[in-house]
Amino acid sequence: MDHNQYLLTMFFADDDSFFKYLASQDDESSLSDILQITQYLDFLLLLLIQSKNKLEAVGHCYESLSEEYRQLTKFTDSQDFKKLFNKVPIVTDGRVKLNKGYLFDFVISLMRFKKESSLATTAIDPIRYIDPRRDIAFSNVMDILKSNKVNNN
């Protein structure tokens, strides 16, 4: 199995195997692995944005990726918000699981598609949206949540 296939399969799985794997690696290897994943995510994001543009060209506004879309994430309560931004240290004593079913098939297809796509030959500029760590509104909300946690204890 290719190392990138291994990484992406762990990354897309709905468990903490990816975090356990990264925690067991040295910093340089972890950063290199994260860079590989971001390259594939940038490719997926480019595909999504081009698809959104096609929909908007025929008059359908796809709000999830629209420039005018204001809602970044929907939270039903503050606990969901805290879970998103709470970075708990990862315990490395657990086993890393690898899903070799449909998720693995998806990863292989993604890698082949990226390799054979005409988009892969063009330089992909990094495509990013709001970074919650740098956004003042998110920072203020996090400060409020942290102060509430301190006050409640």
From Swiss-Prot:
Homodimer. Part of a complex composed of the kinase OPG054, OPG092, OPG114, OPG115, OPG142 and OPG157. Interacts with OPG175. It is found in: Virion; Host cytoplasm. Late protein which is a part of a large complex required for early virion morphogenesis. This complex participates in the formation of virosomes and the incorporation of virosomal contents into nascent immature virions. Plays a role in DNA packaging during immature virions (IV) formation. The keyword DNA-binding does not apply. It comes from Vaccinia virus (strain Copenhagen) (VACV). InterPro entries: Poxvirus_J1. Belongs to the orthopoxvirus OPG100 family. It comes from the Viruses. Its main location: virion. Induction: Expressed in the late phase of the viral replicative cycle. Keywords: Host cytoplasm, Late protein, Virion. This is Virion assembly protein OPG100. The keyword NAD does not apply. GO terms for cellular component: host cell cytoplasm; virion component.
